[in-house]
Each structure stands twice: as C-alpha cells, then as structure tokens.
Amino acid sequence: MKLFFVALVIAFFYSCEQDATLINKKTNDAISFNAINRTPSGSYSAAKIKYLAKKKELASKYNNASTKLAKQQIINEAKNVLAEQLVNVIIPFWYGTKWSFDGYTSTPTEGEIACGYFVSTTLKDVGFNVNRYKLAQQRPDLEAKSIQLSDNIKTINNMLVKDLKNYFLKNKKNGVYFVGLDFHVGYLLKTQNELFFIHSNYINNAGVVIEIAENSRAFSSNVYYIADITNNNQLIAKWLLNETIKVRIDQ
C-alpha cells in the first residue's frame, strides 16, 4: 500500500510537470527575428516546396495532438515557421519587382505587381489557401477583415506615423501584420525595436521594398486597418490545415 501511494505521488508530480512544460511553451509564443534576410536563396519553386513540406509535418503533428495545450504548442511553433518563411524566404525573391496599378505577376522580378497582388500572391505562395485575385481586388478594410477572419480588426484614425510606431512597439507582439491604408496595402513587420513596412511601392514605380515604416513616404495615411497574421491562432490553424480563407467582398 505504501509503495502504491509513493507511485501515485510520483505520477501526480510528473503529470503536473508535463502540464507546466506545455503551459510554459504556450505562453512563450513570442516570434523573434535574429536577422532580416533581403537576399533570395536558390529557386523560388524550391523554396516553396521546402517549407510546404515543413507545413505538412506540423499539420500532421497538430492533427495527432490529443490536448488543447499540445495543439497550442504546435500553433506556437507554426507561428515562427510561417514568419520565417514569409519574411526571410518568400518575400526576398520579390524585392525589386516593379509596381504597376494593374500588375498581377505570379513570378518574382518578372512583370509587375500591384500592392494588393503582392500581399495576396505571397500569402498564397507561403501556403495559405486563398484566391489571390479576389483578395487583391477588395478594399483595404475588407482585405484586413478577410485575413483577420472577423470584423475584429484594429482601425486607427488620424495618427502620426511616429505615434503608430510607438503604439506597435508598446502594445503589439513581434510578428507580421497586414496593414491597409487609404489607397494602399502591405505588411508590417514588428521586431523588438523597429517597425518595418513591406510593400509594392507605387512611388516612382519603385516596386517591392522593405522600409522602416517611419521613413516610408507611402506609409502616410488618414486611416490604418490592421490584421494580425503570425499571432492569429485561428489563421495559423487554417494555414496548417489548408482550409480556405474566405474573402470578404463589398456588398
């Protein structure tokens, strides 16, 4: 009886330790960028295939996870994989691709790309199941709601860029966000100490660039519609499971 009691106590503390480990991993979900890559490596098709394989591996683990905590642990891992793939693998191929209002090329540096198509195409190529044509053709606020998967987007009016940067640094987690402006869209990359704007720049037809948001002439706007990408658990799950992102359209 005494041995049974000891074994029961050991099993109890082991179980608590396992749960504590998962809880710690759940809360330690910050996305970190040791460096921002601006140079593509290898071929675009090979880069997509490599990370789609990693996505499938994570999806299998997610489907086989038996508890909510275990699933959340995989979601947290997927956040970092997605952020790394989008910012440091997929997007670098697009730097230098020229802007055009009607541009919709699907091949980096060949042809031209409008701001909405830059976002929708890179989201599709990073593994989201989304209609890149339909998403790119919507108003900035509807694009944001489509990506957020709800009406619960952050709308900021009449804020100076420097104040928006300070808001992000103080209140937002590191990661990638969609941002819609008055007549423009792109990505925001929030790191520990900086806010970057990644977009197909219409000014002087510059095309796809990454800029410090505070220094970007194209980032000035009366309104900002912000949707979370890499810290959006529901969106990450859809990415893993290849579920369709429903595009919100103007009625």
Regions picked out by a protein language model, each given a short descriptive name:
Residues K26-A136:
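N-terminal capping segments
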Residues K2-A7:
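Sec-dependent signal peptide recognition
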Residues L195-F196, S200-N205, V209-Q251:
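Low-complexity, Gly/Ser/Thr/Pro-rich intrinsically disordered linker/tail segments
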Residues Q138-I210:
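...with weaker cross-activation on analogous glycine-rich loops/strands in unrelated enzymes
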Residues E17-D19:
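Bacterial signal peptide processing site
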Residues F12-S15:
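C-terminal motif of bacterial Sec signal peptides marking the signal peptidase cleavage site
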